[in-house]
């Protein structure tokens, strides 16, 4: 897995790349506050079959920051601009958490960009669309994640900053991905960790059934970041 930089408008966007340059492109998209670092184990599993690209969206990880925190729609636009700058007109995309909302927003508006989608732990479950509802679930899931992931998240959150985190989270909580699902024609796999405290199985089933070509797979015993804790199992689903 190697670092890769691309200029997108006024910003430099950092990504990690792996796999043969002539293999089909697969983009891995991170969640709220974190960089693509926690996608690296999965990228390594996928690299023999795919050209894997793991961007840090603007303001996340090592990428330059936009002047202000981007909304879900703004992040989707940033993803589209990065895909264009990379010369990637059509890709398979796997996203986690907030990244699923970004992917859904872009795929609903520009469906021709996506061959296939994999949504891992898609947010936001309508029952928990407030900071008060989400905070306890964050801590419950945190105790189910490995310590190695906690270290990655701590570094990424410190870099992202509390004000940008709050603004981005506010946009995510106000987003309604369920209203966009019917406009996504790409085959889409919804993946949920069986011990994911962030999103319920009922919500993930609603996402899968709301998609014209959706399917739900539950990976038993795994938390929200199932792609990190069970990369080989998730890679086998892609």
List each language-model region with its residue ranges.
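Short beta-strand/loop motif that positions the catalytic acidic residue
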Residues: 183-184, 190-192, 196
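Catalytic histidine-centered segment of alpha/beta-hydrolase-like enzymes
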Residues: 222-235
């Amino acid at each position: 897995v190697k670092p890769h930089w691309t200029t997108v408008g006024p910003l430099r966007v950092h990504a990690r790349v792996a796999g043969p340059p002539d293999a089909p492109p697969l983009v891995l998209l991170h969640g709220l506050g974190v960089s693509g670092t926690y996608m690296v184990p999965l990228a390594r599993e996928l690299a023999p079959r795919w050209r894997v690209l793991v961007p840090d969206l603007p303001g996340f990880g090592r990428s330059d920051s936009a002047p202000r925190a981007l909304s879900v729609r703004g992040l989707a636009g940033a993803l589209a601009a990065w895909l264009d700058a990379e010369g990637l007109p059509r890709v398979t995309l796997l996203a986690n958490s907030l990244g699923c909302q970004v992917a859904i927003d872009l795929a609903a508006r520009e469906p021709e960009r996506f061959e296939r989608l994999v949504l891992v732990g898609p947010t936001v479950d309508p029952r928990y669309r407030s900071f008060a509802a989400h905070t306890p679930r964050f801590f419950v899931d945190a105790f189910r994640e490995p310590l190695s992931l906690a270290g990655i998240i701590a570094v990424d959150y410190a870099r992202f900053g509390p004000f940008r985190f709050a603004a981005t989270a506010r946009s995510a909580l106000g987003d309604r991905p369920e209203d966009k699902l019917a406009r996504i024609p790409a085959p889409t796999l919804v993946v949920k960790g069986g011990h994911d405290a962030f999103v319920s199985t009922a919500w993930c089933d609603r996402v899968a059934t709301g998609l014209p070509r959706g399917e739900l797979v539950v990976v038993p015993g795994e938390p929200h970041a199932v792609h990190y804790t069970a990369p080989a199992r998730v890679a086998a689903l892609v």
